[in-house]
């Protein structure tokens, strides 16, 4: 009973976490790029 719920939570959190890290890295890249020039 617990495993499907756990799989659903993991499958829900993983894309959000990856998207959050990607957005954060992209914003830091833009900020660094603007600061460089």
Swiss-Prot record:
GO cellular component: chloroplast thylakoid membrane; cytochrome b6f complex
One Pfam family this sequence matches: PetG
GO MF term set: electron transporter, transferring electrons within cytochrome b6/f complex of photosystem II activity
Transmembrane segments: 5-25
InterPro entries: Cyt_6/f_cplx_su5, Cyt_6/f_cplx_su5_sf
Record's keyword terms, sorted: Chloroplast, Electron transport, Membrane, Photosynthesis, Plastid, Thylakoid, Transmembrane, Transmembrane helix, Transport
Keyword Transport: yes
SUPFAM superfamilies cross-referenced by the UniProt entry: PetG subunit of the cytochrome b6f complex
Membrane-topology annotation of the record: Single-pass membrane protein
Record GO biological process: cytochrome complex assembly; photosynthesis
Subcellular location: Plastid, Chloroplast thylakoid membrane
Quaternary context: The 4 large subunits of the cytochrome b6-f complex are cytochrome b6, subunit IV (17 kDa polypeptide, PetD), cytochrome f and the Rieske protein, while the 4 small subunits are PetG, PetL, PetM and PetN. The complex functions as a dimer.
Function: Component of the cytochrome b6-f complex, which mediates electron transfer between photosystem II (PSII) and photosystem I (PSI), cyclic electron flow around PSI, and state transitions. PetG is required for either the stability or assembly of the cytochrome b6-f complex.
Similarity comment: Belongs to the PetG family.
Protein known as: Cytochrome b6-f complex subunit 5
Lineage of the organism: Eukaryota, Viridiplantae, Chlorophyta, core chlorophytes, Chlorophyceae
């Amino acid at each position: 009973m617990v495993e499907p719920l756990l799989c659903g939570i993991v499958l829900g959190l993983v894309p959000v976490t990856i998207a959050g890290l990607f957005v954060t890295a992209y914003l830091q890249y833009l900020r660094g790029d603007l600061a460089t020039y």
